Amino acid sequence: MTDFKPTAVPLIACDPFFSVWAFENELTADHTRHWTGNRHSLFGLLFIDGVPFRFLGKACLSSDGRYFPELPALEQVALEVTPTASVYTFRHEACTLKVTFLTPLLPHRLEVMSRPVSYVFYEITPAEEGHTFSVRFDACCELAGDLCGKAHRIAEQDGHAIVGRDEQNVLNRSGDDHRIDWGYLHLVHPSARVELDLHRRFFYTEGRWKDKKKIADEFDASHGDVLPADQVPVLAADSDKLSDCFVIAYDDVKSIMYYHKPMDAYYKKFYGDFDTMLAVAVNEAEALREECAAFDKQKKKKMEKVSSEYAQVGALAF
């Protein structure tokens, strides 16, 4: 790893509410958090020949960690922060895993910059033949609420998993130490679904995932069920590809109160509504990745004319 160790690393950096960071040097050393310090849990596992290893966050959502011990973590060997992405590299004797958290903040393309959408790309490079690999990624309902202990409405549709507060009071608060408490978190992937924190716990204690049919008996996300406050939904997806992308987005319904008038997000000027915008954002994932890489390279080249240290700090500040 390089000597450059940011105080916190941006993972999702769309706006002050849709904002998730890694506060520790290693991505598996702690839960991911909102910039205010409150837990906003993203979680990731890499399965190598069926054996799970953590590469992102922690699984246990209890306050004291008593429910179960954490699974072994992959060795983190590199971190690079660019103007639009944070790239982590992990190593195992069977493979190398690269995970890219991309928020396409392209100032010359406001229709893209204003989208409340981030991408989690991963690439697995096998060290030898004969191994199987799969990846699990999930996002907790904490990203859709200020504090825990409230009922949530969930939904699944066309490769989308969705969660938000059952009671929607849009733009109900302001100030520094607040998280969003309205709107809906979306996870987009062909396998995207709604699960519960209990299912994570079941896997950790039983060594296997709960049967999907049994999960379906617990709630019906396809019809927009409401889960009581004592249940903690997570949006989950998995993939057995060597490279793939999970898209995570936030529909805040209204974005700002302007002279007592709730105003739409800027992206709606271009797309009309959230669903149209999200469909475009999903389709453009790979193209945006390439465009952001070119943008980052150009910015880095300019900043390195001052110094390499300036380029590192400048990329983080962007």
What are these regions (language model features)?
Residues C14, T96, G130-S134:
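Exposed beta-strand and adjacent loop surfaces of beta-rich binding modules
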Residues S118-P126:
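Short, well-ordered beta-strand segments enriched in hydrophobic/aromatic residues
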Residues S62-R115, T205-A229, A315:
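Extended, loop-rich substrate-binding clefts of extracytoplasmic carbohydrate-active enzymes
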Residues M1-T7, L106-V112, A127-F318:
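Acidic/polar, glycine-enriched structural segments that form the non-catalytic walls/loops
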Residues V9, C14-E93, L185-F203:
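An extended acidic
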Residues F53-A59, K98-L102, R136, R165, ...:
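Short amphipathic beta-strand/extended segments with alternating polar/hydrophobic composition
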Residues A13, T84, P116-S118, H131, ...:
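Residues that flank catalytic or metal-binding motifs in active/ligand-binding sites
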